[in-house]
């Protein structure tokens, strides 16, 4: 459990943290999280806004947990669109899921389109989602760490991004942005260049990248008498990172090194180690996997269930407000009228027991026994002067009921407004670039897309 909590709390673990903690949750360098006994956490604002919305929690069904010592949700519907917050691999018996996250703003725009389309259809509440609609709104994976995803075209006129969203399975080739600093540092004989990795692929750590580059350099020295391109010593390959937003792996090149050759070596290492096999496995009622699932299927199932749950929640809230008004009207009738209150108190005192008193009073004042039981608990402390307060509460509840009726008449609009509010607070612009290419190991293409040049100030 401590490991799962750490993953949800890391700024480089998921796109939107569900947990906030001041404890050590590991680092982008590969450091492990602190021991569980030192860990204190609380839910983040994103989790409270999306996963623990009061409207949906009121109608969530629960069942006994594994040990029957508590309860857990049968199904947990949230305001977080499908796969917005997935940047982790999940594995279980006989099946696994490894699906990178998509952008929250893109998902909300897509949901807004689907809700508007559904509102105009004859079968309101049952959503239809096509693959072409998905491809129009969802551009592909979006990692909090940025980077570039190469959309590799195939012979059958499909591509990696289409496979990712439509077929539920693909291989994504993720590469970081690399800065070339000309004349970065002074050496004997002149100034040498430096390559600086400013991003790291999803799931990688800076130390893992450094180890891979260092091992490749050592292999070159061993096999080809000193064919290395990195300066010897600890200054040749250094990690100056300060979190996921400030990644900085500095590769000092030897004087006279062909920069493009060194860059190609680094790219080859990263492409081999950090291509991601993305897939979502659909399971049947018995928990057995039988096929991959597309994003359109995920979105359709999500919206159908969310619509039904929102409708259920609004009706539950409306019914609760009506019951509150019935109680308030009964209080006005019984507690704010002196004669009725005397009758009420006398009946309580003369009845042989509480149950008998509740039944007599329910018949006398023509209200439910539950309302009478509630009024008995406050009868001795309630004042006849509270009538105006009760009336104000009734008026407030009636306004809330009218607002709920408006939402029930157009649940799609209610859902759009809710998602827009979440995107406004928690959404961010896309950080991951999508680059179409037909050949992955094209040195000129990689140089053009990944490298930007600066010159060190002297």
PLM ranges: what are they?
Residues 4-8, 39-46, 76-79, 103, ...:
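General structural feature for long, well-ordered alpha-helical segments within catalytic domains
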Residues 82, 88-458:
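C-terminal interaction appendages of subunits in large macromolecular complexes
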Residues 1-52:
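Long, structured ligand/cofactor-binding scaffold of large enzymes
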Residues 2-11, 67-79, 166-173, 223, ...:
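Conserved alpha/beta core surface patches that mediate binding of polyanionic ligands
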Residues 14, 56-57, 80, 86-88:
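Short coil/turn connectors at secondary-structure junctions
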Residues 16-26, 58-69, 224-239, 438:
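Long, charged, glycine-rich C-terminal linkers/tails
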Residues 30-34, 67-71, 75, 98-102, ...:
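Alpha-helix capping and helix-loop boundary segments enriched in small/acidic/polar residues
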Residues 37-71, 198-229:
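A short, contiguous, amphipathic alpha-helix enriched in charged residues
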């Amino acid at each position: 459990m401590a490991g799962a909590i750490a993953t949800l709390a890391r700024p480089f673990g998921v796109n939107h943290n569900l947990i906030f903690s001041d404890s050590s949750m590991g680092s982008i360098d590969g450091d492990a999280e602190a021991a569980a006994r030192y860990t204190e956490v609380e839910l983040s604002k994103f989790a409270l806004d999306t996963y623990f919305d009061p409207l949906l929690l009121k109608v969530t069904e629960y069942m006994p947990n594994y040990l029957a010592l508590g309860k857990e949700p049968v199904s947990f519907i949230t305001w977080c669109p499908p796969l917005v917050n997935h940047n982790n691999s999940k594995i279980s018996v006989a099946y696994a899921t490894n699906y990178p996250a998509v952008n929250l703003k893109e998902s909300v725009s897509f949901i807004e389109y689907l809700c508007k389309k559904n509102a105009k259809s004859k079968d309101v509440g049952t959503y239809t989602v096509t693959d072409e609609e998905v491809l129009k709104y969802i551009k592909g994976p979006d990692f909090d760490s940025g980077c570039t995803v190469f959309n590799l075209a195939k012979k059958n006129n499909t591509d990696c991004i289409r496979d990712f969203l439509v077929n539920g399975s693909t291989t994504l080739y993720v590469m970081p942005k690399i800065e070339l600093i000309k004349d970065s540092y002074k050496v004997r004989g002149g100034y040498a260049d430096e390559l600086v990795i400013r991003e790291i692929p999803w799931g990688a750590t800076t130390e893992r990248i450094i180890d891979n580059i260092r091992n490749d350099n050592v292999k070159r020295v061993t096999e080809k008498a000193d064919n290395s391109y990195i300066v010897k010593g600890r200054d040749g390959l250094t990690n100056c990172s300060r979190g996921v937003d400030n990644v900085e792996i500095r590769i000092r090149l030897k004087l006279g090194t062909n920069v493009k050759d060194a860059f190609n070596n680094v790219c080859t290492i990263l492409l081999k180690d950090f291509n991601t096999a993305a897939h979502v496995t659909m399971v049947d009622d018995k928990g057995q996997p039988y096929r991959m699932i597309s994003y359109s299927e995920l979105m359709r199932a999500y919206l159908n269930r969310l619509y039904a749950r929102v409708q259920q929640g609004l009706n539950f809230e409306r019914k609760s407000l009506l019951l509150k008004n019935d109680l308030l009207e009964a209080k006005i009738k019984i507690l704010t009228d002196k004669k009725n209150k005397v009758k009420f108190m006398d009946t309580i005192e003369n009845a042989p027991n509480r149950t008998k008193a509740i039944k007599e009073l329910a018949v006398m004042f023509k209200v439910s026994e539950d309302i009478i039981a509630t009024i008995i608990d406050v009868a001795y402390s309630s004042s006849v002067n509270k009538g105006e307060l009760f009336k104000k509460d009734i008026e407030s509840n009636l306004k809330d009921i009218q607002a709920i009726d408006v939402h029930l008449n157009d649940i799609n609009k209610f859902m759009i407004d809710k998602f827009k509010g979440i995107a406004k607070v928690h959404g961010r612009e896309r950080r991951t670039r999508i680059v179409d290419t037909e050949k992955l190991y094209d040195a000129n293409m990689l140089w053009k897309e990944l490298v930007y040049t600066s010159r060190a100030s002297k």
